[in-house]
Amino acid sequence: MQTDRPKPDSPKRKHRWYQFSLRALLIVTMVVAVGSGWLGRKIERKRIERDAIAGIEALGGSVWYDYQQGQFSEPSGPGWLRGLLGDDFFGEVVKAHLVGNMIGDAGLANVKGLPRLETLELSGAYVNEAGVAKIKDLTELESLDLSTTNVTDVELANIKDLPRLRSLDLSSTNVTDPGLANLKGLNQLRVLKLKYTKVTDAGVKGLQQALPACRIDR
């Protein structure tokens, strides 16, 4: 009795399977490469962030993560993975508090390692142009407190391009009318405090015309 034998795959079928396997391998390789590249970049960014936080805390400052600001007390992400990579890997530092005369220009250099910062409090800090220059790259910044510092008109040039800034406290600083010209482009500014400065009524009026939606306290 003659039995049917399975027919071997045709060359065309083998070729199609080979093409599919090669294509799938290439896709998987690309996904792994992209994923590992992203992971590597984030690990490096978090390393820089941790160094910045250590520098801030060494000067008596404090930082807060985004998940500490809202209703959640811990970051998103599975617990086992947070245990492996750390809670901070799944959060962003959004607030930094560096007040008092222990904070100088060198200490302020740490904020460059916190690119997602939204609130920065520097009341009483001993900062000059070199220190304030570190702030200009914090494009996510929404609230900045420079009260009771030795900030002058010169330093204001370093904050004129912060696109999201909504609150700025310059109380008890050496700011004068000419320096206010640097603030006229801050279209998102809603609160500006100028108490105990040398700013005049004329200076406030000129700035108010440029920023009609901003409340200026003087």
Model regions: which residues?
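LRR N-terminal entry segment and analogous cap-like coil->beta motifs
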Residues: A54-K136, E140-D153, R166
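Cullin-RING E3 adaptor/co-adaptor recruitment helices
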Residues: T3-A52, E57, W64
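Ser/Thr-centric signal marking residues that sit
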Residues: S21, G104, A125-N128, T149-T152, ...
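Stable alpha-helical elements in mature extracytoplasmic
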Residues: I48-A52, G107, G131, E155, ...
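C-terminal capping segment of individual leucine-rich repeats
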Residues: F89, N110-G113, K134-D137, N158-D161, ...
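Beta-strand-rich cores of mature extracytoplasmic or soluble domains
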Residues: Q2, L114, E118, Y196-T197, ...
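Ankyrin-repeat and related helical/solenoid repeat scaffolds used for protein-protein interactions
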Residues: P163-K198
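Leucine-rich solenoid repeat scaffolds
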Residues: K184-R218
